[in-house]
């Protein structure tokens, strides 16, 4: 099967950031056919994918797009299992090895009601992310005094359920961010992908992993 026979169905509106690479540009450069599924803000639904399930289709986009529009395409989308929940893997290893070892867990809808308690525990700034590896919203740090506006914005953009469990921890400064692929306990490849909040891809970090 040649790469021209592989088709992609994508929805990238939620991922667009100025200066960041776009997957649709990579598909165009490689002459790969793709369909961009638009998100309707009124119905909160994605447009249907016009490909057949007997075609080779790769899916890429937000979790809701994958869950609602994957009709059984092969290979489809690559995602996460429950063992990528932070509460799962952080309970298997010494918590002091984790950046957010001081974390606690709260349902998304309860965070706003725990404002003063969180301030007493963590100080003026906190970090919030979904427990799930699927990340229905991107983790963020926020000043406790601004938490109402930030949670309201997150609800409107990402629509997390009120009962979705979230990791809440003291906000910490991050310079470098990395991703590595590990197989059978061995780091196979990886890269730095961000430095001080800006896109900065480096691949000379494998030996340091």
Can you name each region flagged by the protein language model?
Residues 2-209:
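Active-site nucleotide/adenylate-binding loops and adjacent lid/helix of ATP-dependent enzymes
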